[in-house]
Structure formats: structure tokens, C-alpha cells
Design a protein with these regions (language model features):
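PLP-dependent aminotransferase-like
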Residues: 93-151
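PLP-dependent aminotransferase class I/II
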Residues: 204-246
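Short active-site oxyanion
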Residues: 47-50, 72-73, 97-99, 221-222
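Short glycine-rich anion-binding loops that position phosphate/pyrophosphate groups of nucleotides
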Residues: 33-36, 80, 106, 153-157, ...
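Active-site pre-lysine segment of PLP-dependent enzymes
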Residues: 114, 121, 132-145, 157-180, ...
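Phosphate-binding glycine-rich loop
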Residues: 56-98, 116
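N-terminal "arm"/small-domain region of PLP-dependent enzymes with the aminotransferase-like
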Residues: 1-66, 145
Length: 246
């Protein structure tokens, strides 16, 4: 069993996911218990009376092309907040596991962890050195109960990138030991290129991406979790069946 699976909660490995109604336009969808008529004013192509496709194939493929990854390594989520929640539910056991984050940073990492009953370990960024991450301090503080390590780069709210050398050192040291999550919500506004090609190097690495910022689609709530195909399959066991809207 690879580390992506062995780090997960045992229950997730055996849970039977919700079986959503088959999504084929050619079907007469009596099995989905949907209203057969459209509501007044509905001008959508798919029809608001119908459940949406859980993972729209066209959207998955377009996002995979945009981020330079294969479709099997991408899950479309209801904003990147949902991806954070999914990772917490997959990997964190209440009262046993922990996350690590570099503060100050985006608040949802710790919110999702605390909802799951996990400990939150904080490694302060070094303000005197441009809010850089202290790699040695982070690695010294890590212990096997830390299942998720969040690295927001560019960081919210300090706006700085954490540095390729620092991120690479953390990924190398924790490969196979923890899920390292690099949040690239603001990467389009950075001088640094996305590090998503590292997925081929580090199986326990994951990325968060979103269309909310540079693409000005915050109201559409379209995010993505990028990771090893086994991680994406675990997430598909946990994600609500119709979290994306038509």
C-alpha cells in the first residue's frame, strides 16, 4: 500500500461511496427522482430541474489542461475550501492526528482541522526575513501524527512566495510521511511558475487551485484538488455527490 493510502483514515479505505444517479443525457431519468419540468425562467442548457453532472468531464479536462496535469490527478471542488475539507476528512482522526501550518496564513486550514477534531500546529513565518518559512524549525517540529502540512505560496495574507528551495526541501523531507499541500490560489499573480510538475516527483504532494482570484469567478465556486490518482479516488469517496451547481 502506498503512502497516499496508508496515511488515510482506515474507514475511508473501506467506505462505500454514495451512488449518484447515472448522468447520461440519453437516459429517461426516472431513477433520479427529479421534477420532469423546468422551473419558470430557466434558460440553462442542462435544466435546473436536473441534478448536475458530479464531475463534469469537459470541465475536468479543461482544468487539467489549464494546470498542466492529467485528468486522473484532478478533482473539481466547490471552491478550494471544499478541497481542504475533503483532505481533513480523509486524513485526520479526531484526537489523534494534526496539521501543520505556517502562520499567519489562510484561516480555513485550521478551521477544517478543528472541525475534524485534529490538533493545529503553528510554525511562525519569519517576519524579519520577508515572511520566509523556517524549514529547519518546521521539520524539527514535525512528528508522525502530523498528516497534513499546509504551505500557502504565494501566502495569504503576507503575499510572498515561500521560495522554491524551501518548498522542495520540505517536500523531499516529508515525502511518504505526510501529505504536503501547496495552496496556489494566487499563483497567477506571482513571478514564480506553478509547481504542479512536482506531482510526478512526490506522490504525497497535493495542490489547491481556484478560479476565484485571477479568473474573477469567486461566485462560481470552482476550485480543484490536484494529487496522486489514489488521492483523487479517496476524495471521490468523500465528496458530496452534487457539490457543483449547473
Amino acid at each position: 500500500m502506498n503512502a497516499v493510502l496508508s496515511l488515510a483514515r482506515p474507514e475511508i479505505l473501506t467506505i462505500k461511496p454514495y451512488s449518484h444517479a447515472a448522468w447520461l443525457p440519453s437516459l429517461t431519468r426516472l431513477h433520479a427522482n427529479e421534477a420532469p419540468w423546468r422551473p419558470t425562467g430557466d434558460a440553462t442548457e442542462a435544466g435546473l430541474n436536473r441534478y448536475p453532472e458530479p464531475q463534469p468531464a469537459g470541465l475536468v479536462q479543461r482544468l487539467a489542461e489549464l494546470y498542466g496535469v492529467s485528468a486522473e490527478t484532478l478533482l473539481v471542488t466547490h471552491g478550494s475550501d471544499e478541497a481542504i475539507d475533503l483532505l481533513s476528512r480523509i486524513y485526520l482522526r479526531a484526537g489523534l492526528d494534526a496539521i501543520m501550518q505556517c502562520t499567519p496564513t489562510f484561516g480555513m486550514y485550521q478551521v477544517a482541522a478543528r472541525i475534524q477534531g485534529a490538533e493545529v500546529m503553528e510554525i511562525p513565518l519569519d517576519r524579519s526575513r520577508g515572511w520566509s518559512v523556517d524549514v529547519d524549525r518546521l521539520l524539527a517540529a514535525w512528528h508522525p501524527r502530523v498528516k497534513l502540512v499546509y504551505l500557502c505560496s504565494p501566502n495569504n495574507p503576507t503575499a510572498n512566495s515561500l521560495g522554491i528551495a524551501a518548498l522542495e526541501a520540505i517536500c523531499q523531507a516529508l515525502d511518504g510521511k505526510a501529505i504536503v499541500v501547496i495552496d496556489e490560489a494566487y499563483i497567477e499573480w506571482s513571478n514564480s511558475a506553478s509547481l504542479t510538475p512536482w506531482l510526478a516527483r512526490f506522490p504525497t504532494l497535493a495542490f489547491l487551485r481556484t478560479l476565484s482570484k485571477a479568473h474573477a469567478l469567486a461566485g462560481a465556486r470552482i476550485g480543484a484538488l490536484l494529487g496522486h490518482p489514489d488521492m483523487i479516488q479517496l476524495a471521490k469517496r468523500v465528496i458530496p455527490p452534487y457539490s457543483l451547481t449547473t
